[in-house]
């Protein structure tokens, strides 16, 4: 990677950080969004200027198709439907991580990580972990999208031994990753993908539709770590930095939301977020989850309200 490319990626990373800073407050959100767009533009132009790019025609076609689809969705989407749109986009990031890892496994020479059957241990670890996170993100986001859109029931789906099955699957994925890094067997690679797909579903189905915003934020974190995994596979510092930013900010936001709703952050990670609601469904029906707010929340709602009624 040339010095100029490294410098451009560094500038993009700084712009992404400033973008997150701007998006943290309504008054600076527009500026933060602009800085994010600018950073992404610099990153794309820098990547396309790489001499290693083989076909601008194929990239141009992909840009055109993706741009048309994205523009069409952005024009038609309602503000109330943004959470499920974000969940759908997260699923694509996870699937991309799986595809990149598969490409690196079957054609490692294209990624400068050795040859088939003799990939370095470090690259195998990065590849397999990125694959697992990406696969979990993909299926988890699909279920979240379905719940928010109404394609899947928003009621928590809880069954006996659920956490035990999740634990077994988690340990099984770890064992498969270790075995894959030793044997470099393609069957093990796809077993990792399949097991991660399954646990991604099992982690989200016990969560109620009303609590989906927290899960979307958590899946945002997962997609960030998946992107960071892609960055390690591609030896791309910008992807690593950006993925880490998205991953950490998504996790922090999820923690803040859980704290504000008196929920356990650990339950989000373990897929037991909706369990308490499901277990207490037969109790007093008038119980509601208390939602905390502060002066900043009240000021924001009043500032953006068209009509205010004071009783």
Q: Where in the sequence are the language-model features?
A:
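N-terminal transmembrane signal-anchor/hairpin module of polytopic inner-membrane proteins
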Residues: 1-56
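C-terminal ends of transmembrane helices
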Residues: 15-28, 67-86, 141-156, 199-212, ...
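Cytoplasmic-side transmembrane-helix entry/capping segments in multi-pass membrane proteins
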Residues: 28-39, 59-62, 81-93, 156-168, ...
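Transmembrane alpha-helix boundary signature
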Residues: 47-60, 72-83, 98-116
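Transmembrane helix-loop junctions at the membrane interface of multipass transporters and ion channels
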Residues: 103-117, 182-187, 214, 221-242
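Membrane-interfacial segments at transmembrane helix termini in multi-pass membrane proteins
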Residues: 245-305
């Amino acid at each position: 990677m040339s010095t100029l490319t490294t410098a451009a990626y560094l500038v993009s990373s700084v712009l992404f950080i400033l973008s997150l800073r701007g998006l943290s407050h309504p008054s600076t959100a527009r500026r933060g969004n602009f800085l994010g767009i600018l950073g992404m533009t610099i990153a794309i132009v820098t990547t396309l200027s790489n001499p290693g790019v083989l076909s601008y025609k194929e990239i141009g076609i992909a840009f055109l198709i993706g741009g048309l689809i994205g523009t069409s969705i952005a024009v038609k989407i309602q503000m109330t439907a943004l959470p499920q749109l974000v969940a759908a986009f997260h699923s694509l990031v996870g699937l991309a991580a799986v595809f990149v890892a598969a490409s690196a496994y079957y054609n490692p020479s294209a990624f400068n990580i050795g040859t088939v059957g003799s990939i370095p241990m470090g690259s195998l670890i990065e590849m397999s972990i990125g694959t697992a996170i990406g696969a979990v993100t993909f299926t988890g986001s699909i279920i979240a999208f379905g719940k928010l859109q109404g394609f899947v029931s928003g009621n928590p789906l809880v069954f006996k031994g659920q956490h035990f099955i999740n634990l077994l699957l988690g340990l099984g994925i770890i064992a498969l990753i270790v075995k894959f890094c030793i044997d470099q067997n393609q069957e093990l690679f796809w077993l990792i993908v399949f097991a991660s797909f399954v646990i991604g579903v099992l982690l989200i189905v016990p969560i109620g539709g009303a609590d989906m915003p927290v899960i979307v934020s958590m899946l945002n974190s997962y997609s960030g770590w998946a992107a960071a995994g892609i960055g390690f596979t591609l030896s791309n510092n910008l992807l690593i930095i950006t993925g880490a930013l998205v991953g950490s900010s998504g996790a922090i936001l999820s923690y803040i939301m859980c704290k504000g709703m008196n929920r356990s952050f650990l339950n989000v990670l373990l897929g037991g977020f909706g369990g308490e609601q499901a277990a207490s469904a037969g109790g007093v029906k008038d119980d509601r989850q208390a939602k905390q707010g502060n002066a900043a929340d009240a000021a924001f709602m009043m500032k953006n309200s068209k009509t205010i009624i004071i009783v």
